[in-house]
Regions:
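Extracytoplasmic copper-binding redox domains, predominantly the cupredoxin/blue-copper superfamily
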Residues: 2-8, 18-105
């Protein structure tokens, strides 16, 4: 193998190794007083798009205190997951609206 090709191969290998993984975006919807999906999985660093399709204000309030997201009617709010774990959350205004989010490290 020619020295130039070795350098090119090494440079492309280093680029592939050093490129961080791209964070994902997960959509969670509040519609007709239901959270969908009711069970979701994500990773630390991922973004959650909380989409409120209802005419009511909703929250996504973690029972363990990890987050408390306020969602005005007919609006979308985003947040970034900062901590791993299984999080049960609900709407403070409509306590029957509940779901679980599992966040991997």
């Amino acid at each position: 193998m020619k020295p130039g090709w070795i350098l090119l191969f090494a440079a492309s290998l280093m680029t592939a190794i050093s490129v961080p993984a791209t964070a994902a975006t997960l959509q969670i919807t509040m519609d007709n007083l239901v959270i969908s999906p009711s069970e979701a999985s994500a990773e630390v660093g991922d973004t959650i798009e909380w989409i409120n399709k209802d005419v009511f204000v909703h929250t996504a309030t973690a029972r363990n205190g990890d987050f408390d997201i306020n969602m005005p009617a007919k609006k979308t709010v985003t947040s970034v997951l900062k901590k791993a774990g299984t999080i049960e959350y609900y709407c403070r205004f409509h306590p029957n609206m509940k779901a679980t989010l599992t966040v991997a490290p």
